[in-house]
Amino acid sequence: MAWFRRKQKGILTPTEHKKEIPDGLWYKSPKGKIIQIKELKENVYVSPEDGYHVRIGSKEYFELLFDNNQFTEIAANLTSADPLEFIDNKPYTQRLQQAQQDTQLKDSIQVGYGPVNGNSMVIACMDFNFIGGSMGSVVGEKIAKAVDHALEHKAPLLIISKSGGARMMEAGLSLMQMAKTSAKLLQLAKARIPYISLLTDPTTGGVTASFAMLGDFNIAEPGALIGFAGPRIIRDTIGRDLPKGFQTSEFLLEHGFLDFIVDRRMLKATLTKLLTMLANN
């Protein structure tokens, strides 16, 4: 098959004749599978080649779950203050402004209320692109308002977690949100209103240690990293190699921390089945 071999080496195509490949035309999964971005979007950002679930944000989850993407946003304009006047390599206020500019979000969580296959639901979804999906006072307050809305309308609550944990720039105020969100979710339990927690890649730190693991059903996407401290920190602390697949959703399911794993393409149908089953009991 020498048809495509050049007889002369070193022949260069003039720059003006080269065809440019547009940025973002292809996606390469961690396993090396190549897929067109258009096909990836049509497949709700799941690689059809290997099933890899690409990280997405609240915009994409809301488009996937709410019927015709119709929903009412709750507490849309809440933003973090800076009572500690925190500064690391830049002031916290500047970091917030930069994150808001880059993501077009107010903070690392959005809350919406609308129909999911005709059934009303409150959905709170975290965005990892906003300061690592970190949990600060706004996250705690928005989850509290999501619970209040679910109680008022007797609607089930879904929280989609994707976070690096508590936001260090808010220090103790951030850690307080662990107790605040846990206490609010207890109100849902007492009212017998379902709370489903979906853990996605990654869910770690104080988020895992609070609302992410308190669902009536704790479910996860395939291959998600879920834990408190990261695997590198644990390995360095105990001085041992960790089991294969440690802290993946499959590992947690095998050890009883999750109820089941759901493919993102089946998420909406699975939620509907789950809530129908609960409504009939």
UniProtKB/Swiss-Prot annotation:
Pathway: Lipid metabolism; malonyl-CoA biosynthesis; malonyl-CoA from acetyl-CoA: step 1/1
GO BP: fatty acid biosynthetic process; malonyl-CoA biosynthetic process
GO MF annotations in UniProt: acetyl-CoA carboxylase activity; ATP binding; carboxyl- or carbamoyltransferase activity
Localization annotation: Cytoplasm
Keyword Cell inner membrane: no
Chain ranges of the CoA carboxyltransferase N-terminal domain: 24-281
Keyword ATP-binding attributed: yes
Annotated keywords: ATP-binding, Cytoplasm, Fatty acid biosynthesis, Fatty acid metabolism, Lipid biosynthesis, Lipid metabolism, Nucleotide-binding, Transferase
Role, per record: Component of the acetyl coenzyme A carboxylase (ACC) complex. Biotin carboxylase (BC) catalyzes the carboxylation of biotin on its carrier protein (BCCP) and then the CO(2) group is transferred by the transcarboxylase to acetyl-CoA to form malonyl-CoA.
Protein name as it appears in the record: Acetyl-coenzyme A carboxylase carboxyl transferase subunit beta
Species for this entry: Amoebophilus asiaticus (strain 5a2)
